[in-house]
Structures are given as structure tokens and as C-alpha cells.
């Protein structure tokens, strides 16, 4: 097995298979969930809007892969700084049955100099999760500056984030290797317990392999597991499957 095929299989097992589109329906979400398990492997999670969590869990059970986690999003996509709304949305997500919540950090507030509201929001949402996994989307492509990316990462981890995540996938610049390196370096400095999720823009096995290699270099091969590392993507799945089959991945405009 080639190194790239091996990386593709590994990346597939670390995917949060995602649909977060305004035109999502029960049928579209169910179709996505039926792709979670294939002869090429099983993804780590699916990520859908809160109202689709029940249909996602039902479809995954029926597809014979109840172990696939169901993630959802809150304070999404704009990362507003109203803590009470973010907490209410997070509680509602858990009530829907979500296993994991991806909350957007109030990144614009941080850019304006407010370093407190992000900590407060993440801490409150972690408490609202009631033991479920909390991933914090720092929107690295909007923060742009490495110092701000570092600061948002540090605040999120101190406030209790289980993962820090690059992007919503709804802005012009999503996951990049430089942002990932900054975030992973902070995770290492903070003890390596927090996980990392690259979201948006990772579309090929070659690109996925670069993120896997970066994480392994900074935190070790054993760290790179679904407990600590995820890809948030949609079009990536088909391209990984093409790579595993020995074909050539085609360009895609998906998440």
C-alpha cells in the first residue's frame, strides 16, 4: 500500500462528514449519513445543523454504524458575542441528541480587543455541553494574524475546549497549513490534551496527508487519532475513496 493510500484511509477515519447548507433537508442529511460507512472505512462523525441531529442518528443506526458521532454547530456561522444565545443554542443542540458541538468563537470581538468574552462564551458553552465534546471554531482565516490565531487558541483551551477548529467553511479563507501549525503548537504548549480540526478547503488525499504529517511532527503519530484530530469536509470523502481505489481525484467546489 502506498503512503498516500495509507494517508487517505487514515484521513477518512478522521472525517467529520459535513453538510451545513441552507438548502439541507432530511433527505439530504440521510443521504450523507448513508455514506458514513463504506468498504473504504468509517468516518469519525457527521456534522449537521441542530434540527437534523435526530434524523442523522436514526439513519446512522439503520446503516449499521451507530458508533459514528453526530456533531452540530452553534453560534454559527458569525461568531457573535452574545453568550446567552450561544449557551441556549448549545443546550438545544444537546437536547436534540448531539454527541459533539462545534461553537464559533466570538472572533470579531477578539479582533476589536475584547479578550474576555471569548473565554466566557467557551466556558459557558462547555458547561452547557454536559460532558459532550466541545469544538471551538476560531475562524483562523478571518483572524489572519498568527498572534490572533494563537490568542484565540490559547483562550479556547484555557476555557475548556476539547478541540480547536480552524474554520466555519463559510468565509473566503478556511483551513491553511500555517494556521494549523500555529494552533497545533499552542495545543502542544498547553499539554497536548486538546484536539485539532481542520475544516474547509481540505479536498484531496495529498492535502490531508500534509495536515496529518504536520500534526504527527508536532505531537507524535499516536496523538493523531479521532480523539485528537478531525477533518471537517464534504467533497474530501469522494476524493479519498478515489485515491484508495487507485484513481485520480477530481477538483471539487465542495466544503
From Swiss-Prot:
Name of the protein described by the UniProt record: Deoxyribose-phosphate aldolase
Catalytic reaction(s) noted: 2-deoxy-D-ribose 5-phosphate = D-glyceraldehyde 3-phosphate + acetaldehyde
UniProt keyword Lyase, yes or no: yes
HAMAP family: DeoC_type2
GO cellular component: cytoplasm
Annotated organism of origin: Chromobacterium violaceum (strain ATCC 12472 / DSM 30191 / JCM 1249 / CCUG 213 / NBRC 12614 / NCIMB 9131 / NCTC 9757 / MK)
Keyword annotations from UniProtKB, A to Z: Cytoplasm, Lyase, Schiff base
UniProt-recorded Gene Ontology molecular function terms: deoxyribose-phosphate aldolase activity
Pathway assigned in UniProt: Carbohydrate degradation; 2-deoxy-D-ribose 1-phosphate degradation; D-glyceraldehyde 3-phosphate and acetaldehyde from 2-deoxy-alpha-D-ribose 1-phosphate: step 2/2
Signal peptide: none
Role summary: Catalyzes a reversible aldol reaction between acetaldehyde and D-glyceraldehyde 3-phosphate to generate 2-deoxy-D-ribose 5-phosphate.
Name of the encoding gene: deoC
PANTHER family: DEOXYRIBOSE-PHOSPHATE ALDOLASE
Active-site annotation: 102, 165, 197
